[in-house]
Amino acid sequence: MKGDFMEKKNPIIFVIYGKARSGKSTITEYIKEYYQNKNLKAIDLMYAESIKNYAKKIINWDGKEETKPRDFLQQLGTEIIRNQIDGNFFINRMLQDIEVYSYFYDVIIITDARLKQEIEIPYKKYEKVIRIKIEGNNSDLTDKQKQHITETALNNYDEYEYKIINNGTLEQLKNKVNNILDEVK
């Protein structure tokens, strides 16, 4: 089967990183909307997607944000999967996903990088990678959750092309995102 969709598109890849509740998902939606308005196909991918799928089966989580078992997800992802099974488990899955989706999408947005290697490995592997650091408020986490490695590993990591401080209205945030995207080629 041949056609445009079977040719690798060499997509722009955005790697979004920041603490929980900093606005990563909202910013991702703005990026998708921006490119879709230019008739380009955009998709968001999450390192945490497989963890969430495991949680749905293991503890019958309903998948809703309001009932998110954050402690369980942190333990499953770090203590079991990264520490006991494969330190690059999620990165390898993401790289495989990028390879597949590169045939179908012009823009790929990784919405939830939490560790240095989750940013650096895609950055080194692909040609058009834009790293965006998000700073915002994560005050609704417990102290234990705030101290988890997935919340602290990037505290002193400042490798990025763009930084967004999410401290205003949604309209202001959208303007910040659009200004960045106007610069990206």
Task: Identify the residue ranges that each predicted region occupies.
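ATP-dependent small-molecule kinase phosphotransfer cores
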Residues: 43-105
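Hydrophobic anchor at the beta1->P-loop junction of P-loop NTPases
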Residues: 16, 110
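Small-molecule kinase domains that catalyze NTP-dependent phosphoryl transfer to phosphate-bearing small molecules
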Residues: 93, 123-125, 131-185
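Conserved lysine of the Walker
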Residues: 24
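Short, Lys/Arg-enriched N-terminal segments with co-localized hydrophobic residues
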Residues: 1-5
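Hydrophobic positions on the alpha1 helix immediately C-terminal to the Walker A/P-loop
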Residues: 27
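P-loop (Walker A) phosphate-binding loop of NTP-binding proteins
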Residues: 19
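Post-Walker A helix-loop "phosphate-sensing" segment adjacent to the P-loop in P-loop NTPases
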Residues: 33-43
